[in-house]
From Swiss-Prot:
It comes from Caenorhabditis elegans. Expressed in the nerve ring, neurons of the lateral and ventral ganglia, including the sensory neuron ADL, neurons in the retrovesicular ganglion and two neurons in the lumbar ganglion, PVQ and the sensory neuron PHB. Expressed in ASH nociceptive chemosensory neurons. Not expressed in ASK sensory neurons. WD repeats lie at residues 909-948, 951-992, 993-1032, 1035-1074, 1077-1117, 1119-1157, 1162-1201, 1205-1244, 1247-1285, 1287-1328, 1333-1373, 1376-1415, 1417-1456. This is Protein qui-1. Gene3D superfamilies: P-loop containing nucleotide triphosphate hydrolases (3.40.50.300), YVTN repeat-like/Quinoprotein amine dehydrogenase (2.130.10.10). The keyword DNA-binding does not apply. Involved in the avoidance response to the noxious chemicals and repellents such as quinine in ASH and ADL sensory neurons. In response to the noxious chemical quinine, promotes dauer formation induced by pheromones such as the ascaroside ascr#3 in ASH nociceptive neurons. Residues 1507-1592 are annotated as: Disordered. It comes from the Eukaryota.
Amino acid sequence: MFRGKGQQQVSSTDNIKAMMTAAIGNKLEKRLPLVSTIFVVGNDEEEFNIERRTLWQDVLPDLQNLAFQSNFDLEFCDVPLENGELTNSVAEHVLQMWKDNPRSWIVLLLGNRYGNVSVPTSLRKEEYESIRSSIFEENGNVRVFEKAYTINRNGAVEEYRLVPSAIKDKKQLAEIIKALQAGAKAAHEEGSINQVHEQRQNRFFSSPLETFVRSILQVSPCRCLFLLRKFDQLVADPNSPNAFLETNDQNSRKIEDLKNEITLKMNDRVMTHVLRPESTDINYFFNSRDGDKYREKIARQFNEKLKNHLADINPPVRPEPPKSPMVLAANEARTHQEFLENQLALGNLKRDYDKRLDELASVKVNRGVFLIQGTDLCGKTQALCRLYHKISDKDAYKVIFFTNLTYSSNFAHEAWRTICLNICSISNIDPKEVLEHFKLGGILKSLEELVQKADKPVCIFIDDVHLLKFGHLLSQIGRRTETAPDNLSLFMTSSNVAPVNAVFAVTQTVNVDVISENEVVGMVQKMAEKVDKKLTNEQISAIRPLMAAKDGILIAKSFTHEILFNGNSSMKGGMDGRMTRIEKEFGKLAVGNAVKFIAASSHGLTRLEIHDAISADREVLEEMNMSIVYSLLTLDGIIEALGPILRKVIIDDRQIIGIAHSGLISWLRNRYLTSSQDIRSAHLQLSDLFADLLIDNEQSPRHEIAYQSFSQGIKRDNGSPNFRRLRLLWYHCLHSGNLDRLKELSLCHFEYVDYVTRYFGISHLLSLYEECATQILHHDLQVISEQVLVPALVTMARDSEQLAAEVIGRLRFTRHENSHFLNSLVDQAMSWVDLYNRQPLLVPLTCWISPPATKVCRSFTLKDWKPGNTVLTLSANHQYILISGNQSDPGVIYAYHIASEQLIGTFKGHTAAVTCLCSSNDSSLFVSTSFDKTVNVWVFSQSTPTMSLTHHTAKVTCAILTSDDQYLITASADSSAKMIKLETGEVMRSFNDHTGSVVSLQLTSNNQFLITGSGDFVVQMWDVTNGKCISRMGGLMAPVSTLAITSNDAFVVVACEDETLKVFSTVGGQELHELMGHEGKVNSLVCAQDDCQLFAATKSKVFCYDIHNGQMIDVLDTAQPFPICSLKISSDNYFLISPCGPKVTIWNVTKRNHDAHDVHADKEGFLTAVALSNDDKYAACGTNNGIVALWDLEVCQCVFTTIQNKGDPITCIRYSVDSQYCISGNQAGCILILDAQNGGVVRELFMHSSEVLSIMSLVHNKMISCDIQGKMVIWELFGDDDTPEMVATGVKPPIFVPPTGRIMVGHCSLSNKEMKIWAFPEEGPPVTRAKLSHSDEITCFATSPKGGNFIATGSRDMSLKIWQIDKGFLTQVLVGHENVVTCCCISFDERLVVSGARDEKIIVWNVQSGDMVCTVNTTAAITSLSMTGDSTVVFSTTEDGWVETWSTTKGRLLSTFNAHRPIKKLINSYESHRMLLLLENCAQLPILCLHNTPAVGVEATRRRSARAQSVSSASNEPVASTSAGEIKKDPILSSNNGGNAQSAPRATAPKPTFDMLERSKSRTSLIEKDRTTTLTQSNAPPPQKSNMCTLL
């Protein structure tokens, strides 16, 4: 019935161990990437136009869909389209690609034409000399033959290779063929080449098609589908060439013989079609009805046969299971191990550091951290790999890691976690400790523990450790000085010019010198040997001088590859020369487009992705003369020619083609992506590809051949995700600058985030946000990463299925403050839960988990900064800052990228300190003012000013730009302000009324009014259009230091030298109020765009005020002893940037509340009691300040609230048996009766003088209540007065009365070891029926929710006892716990009893036999237990805030939920579609739902719902609704019991969980006060109030 967590595990421990052992072993089985290529081969483009069109239009889309759904890439290569007439060189290229990939397939088209003879691509030396001699003897054209071939001495035997340029001219090609055939025939007749195989001899006279076919027929199994077409009874006119018919009789016989041979040998792979057109006009036939029938027939045949063949050569289609962390680590290990083997494949190259490596390999002696460093491309990686190889597996556990090799090898936290998990696997150590940690500090502590536990030394090898990134989310550890554990040897390579964070103190440093000439020669000779070739002495001599270059080793490898690939190399021009030759061979555009996409990608692309990205650009295709699609053969040739520039790695079963070295990426980007626009354009094209935006579903399938890109949908029909989209879409959206697409399609898209978490791990998901944080400063991404995902790590480590619950719970809490993208993420998470069916799932229906506050977003220290008066401005998109004030160089302006904290430029033009900086609204320019009396205008692309203005006669103090960036207003110590036209630098207007220095400027939003502040104690407002002063803001007692104006122009804030801070009305100029509480002089002011928050900067601190009421909201402390002279707020109103000395701090200022006020309010609203109605429709709760709230559980909203007694906590709450009334008791002894349907007060009783702890229903509308002093009162529910029916003492609460209302269970007041059962007769006082006892204190008791025959008691004596209620007989003593039993529950049918104890153990018992059904262990002491109505599921809550759901049959964990607070109590409905939690210190009512386990009713009165609760659409009207479900009577209850007269009506399960919930609802607090307004967004309506009654 249940699909528990056990089924989620992808592999058992043994399987993972085997996988890891294989990865760490000496030799790995070669993996084939999941890619199939279909080659369509025929004589030329025209002969099989109709068949090829059918393949393109009717077959390829279906095959692409099959491939996508089956998880393999499908490449389609139409050879005639790409290359025209078939030649031997093209045929050999196709054959080689076909043989290299066992998953490829050929569709071979043969018709009536035999094809033209082509020249061989190579001749053996003896063949060449014999033919040349014969041509000479026959007086043939020896010269044209000699020019066509050049000798290649690099093979095992010398041969002559065809020069490609020699056959480009058709006339010259005909002469070569004529001379070659004549020479070959003569040589054969003379006997000089008779020893050659007959087929080799015939190739001089055979068409490429025949040669190609015969090569295919020799391969077994033959992965080829033949279409044999014959036009019967048609004879071609010899004088009129025909694209479909052969004009040469001999060739006609050859093609017929060839087709007959194919039919005999490959009958099951042959499609034979004999067509009988009425004339030689074949095109007329194809346009006829018979032609349509032919086309439909071959389309069916192609579809059927190719689908079957592709299915045979590709793995069977299975849903991709989620990956466990251990499997992810094992997959990573395999990829790194395969790369290691490729590095070692060259063999043992002798280097001058070999002796040093031998010393390091003695791990029994050498322990510590060894740093191998050197220049780029000096062989550090090779040294590390050889060192790894030298250390035996018997002597140590070894793990090797290549930084940036895979998508999970970029960030330190992810890298070290993977390394630790790999160590666990190979050393058989339990990975539990590692799996619980995600932050680098905790991971490194786990590593130290692992190393100590290992029974052998642990050797870790990390390549390019300096490239590991340390993000601020999970990788912040600072500079560590700890020494490595004794059992650890850590070997790392690093550039000798880059800083290294080795995480442990470096023990030794090994320097790798630049590779010598002899070492390079040895390396390139090994390269040749690897492919069974050799280098001549002349070539080696030519390579030696290349080592003088900086990148000599790469040049040598590239030129060697060129020699081995082409047979020769000019060896000129270094790497640029090599690229130029490749461009000349394949076309500059063809090479440039392929390389730019590879260079733009993070780790590389598949060949299909490169092909599709280029094919989507129609303009580029036309420029390359490729009208339909980018040539796959050309692309393969380019990739092969690039050789050592590229590296190929198999990741996610795809071969990823990337740049081989980080140093090459910059070079290639500078060559092919020359501007930032080029880079963004490349990323945008790739984001289009992975967003699946290149698919044109409207494309007509009949009119023209057109290529549709391979699908990149997010998931397949079986639910498996598309790994390539998950890997790359976010990256290219980010770098294209399209942040809306980034959020909408990836990082704020729940399905995307969920898939990344499931298949790559949440640690990798956070790496994506880490990477974004190094590129952009963005609020939404920060919220998701820092306020949702990082706090959810503890939850996700325990239950990966809880991502949706965490997103819903945290982001719904702040729904009204969220952006559209964040709220969409919540909606998608709800919809995801709707469709979730993998296993039971706990989800929150209300929100109470507040996202953690992130006051400081980022801070960084400026290098070599001597603090002074630091001024700063922001770019329009708030990604860059311009800053000045470094006393070491006071006139210099520095530009920093905020996210990466990198200096990106300097601007020099001032001779004295800069006083102000301001940027244009489009970031095209910025303006600076200075003590040198100048105003400079700059553009970001130039380091010198474009304009320098000298209109002032004293220092220029500040400047401001109009909103249209057309005018600049400057202020100076010469007592004036001037308005300057930016385009010309001309002064348009002067403002000269001040008598002191003008120190601050502000403009109204319409640019009409200018506000100036001066040292003459005056603030003036000017009309910009005429330069006249229109008002003055007086009353100041000191010079003005700075000004600020709100964005709605309502208020002007003035700070003065006497430390005063005042708010003025802009309209009237009168002072409104003075702001108090700051310390010292205010140096800078800025108003947030919500027109409410004001930020005032003093020395080291920024004070935040509510500008409307003057209340101080927050204090931001930079902890630097310097004045803050500049404040800027981002255009999106999320971030405040403050420079203080050498430190720049970015603050999150989206909302500031007075914390003390909120804390007090929350404490008043803490819940103290909860109750669930018997029909499961309603809930009630009471708070610490005396509020009773009634909830409609169908919509999960509070519908009524009532104050019982203000300030007296509610201590108990209960519904009547018929669910019509809610009764609550409080600390003062008051009892309140509410009508549950309308919230109206029915009665208020004062029968107790102390805290009421229990209220229960009896028969005949009677109620019983019990207080903390043991006073028990029986009273009438509908009585006219407060006179109790009976008052008694001696009963200690809590008490319990079953729905029958005729007995009561309670504690004895005299002994905590005893309980009693009392019966209520028709007349008279209660009668003691039985006594229940333990040897120690009774800590808990339980009966069936409907009453029943048994009661269970738990005790400090660690036992559980089961008693008969009627007689008080002890039926079972259940012993199994090892600590105090804290809670217990009995199932509805009384078959099972469940107990929980402080020993962190839950035991399910059989009531009749007393046997243990199952036992489960938890992580903390159990606080409460409950069961579903059908007894199949038990819920447990723990002290550490977890709700866990267990199967009562097997004890399997079904689902968990983290409430993030200690849980006191859990109450669930019959089918657990609604669950109530009572948490410590929580002012909201947590309501949960359990999905996918509807209780199967054991009573006929219960009906199972059609499906579990959904989490989708919402009702906007939070009205109390009645269920439309069928209401049944409980046959157990009598029908004449007064208050209990109606049987507890139970409806069917509520409507789908979130169907009736209001999606726009944020948190619902149980107290809403009249608070003084703080922050209302000016551009959005104020947050909607809770639908509860407002309490004053």
